[in-house]
Amino acid sequence: MLHQKFTPAIFSTVIKPEHSDRLVSIITPTYNCAKYIGETIKSVQSQTYQDWEMLIVDDCSSDNTNEIVQQFSETDTRIKYICLSSNSGAAVARNHALKLAQGRWIAFLDSDDLWHSDKLEKQIAYMKKINASFSYTRYSEIREDGEHNNKIISGPKKIGRIRMLAYCWPGCLTVMYDRKKIGLIQIPPIKKNNDYALWLRISHKAPCFLFDKTLASYRKRSGSISSSSYISLIEWHYKLFREIENKSVFSAAILTINNIFWGIYKKLIYTHRL
């Protein structure tokens, strides 16, 4: 089988002038998340920074996600609801939202996670202060019922290309980048780890800086992709390095092993119990 190279597409960086400095585009894929998505949307609506648009792309949910989201979008025009014609995965859903995004600032929030009310305001202020174009924050873990499990996850203060290859340090729900400086890079077509694949693409252009504040809550669900078997995660990491990062068989294997080591390191060093 031929080893095909993936070339990331970079969408136009032309932004409407009135939005060039303030608008945040929030990228939210969803699939059968009716139980949680209302709470997620409310956490965005409660932001102290109100200049945002929330692009919710539904990957053909079979529950009543559409009814819940439409109730919000009918009363808040900043919420844009898009339904895909076929179930295609989170990468396709996120890419669809990216193509529609009008904001300078691009942020990511999955449909079962939550933001603290000052997340956008504080993170943008931090990025402007240090002139960063790519950043992430600490986040807490919550259980399916929304109760905190007393864990805070952090990471390195600065993540360059080499360190990003070592491990996926940023939590997707905390990442923000400056579209003016970086552009809109297409997420590689991979079922799992597609957020990590995007961070790797962005790391070619800019380092990722940690804003060392807890500004989001990640919902740990037993049925989510993030809770897949350990062996499956290892296989998908190898697939990412081999097929998306175009590494040799040997390099992909070494990077995968390296990821296992740094994953253990992150749990020991950057996971704090309250």
Residue ranges and their predicted role:
Residues 118-149:
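Conserved donor NDP-sugar-binding/catalytic core segment of glycosyltransferases
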Residues 99, 152-232, 236-237:
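Conserved nucleotide-sugar donor-binding catalytic segment
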Residues 35-38, 63-71, 114, 118:
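Acidic helix N-cap motif at the loop->helix transition within catalytic regions
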Residues 106:
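Short aromatic/hydrophobic "clamp" motif used to bind/position activated sugar donors
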Residues 84-101, 122:
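Glycine-rich, basic loop-to-helix element that forms the pyrophosphate-binding segment
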Residues 43, 50, 58-67, 86, ...:
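A conserved acidic beta->alpha catalytic loop
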Residues 1-45:
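N-proximal low-complexity "stem/linker" segments adjacent to membrane-targeting elements
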Residues 22-25, 53, 197:
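Cell-envelope/extracellular polymer assembly enzymes that use nucleotide-activated donors
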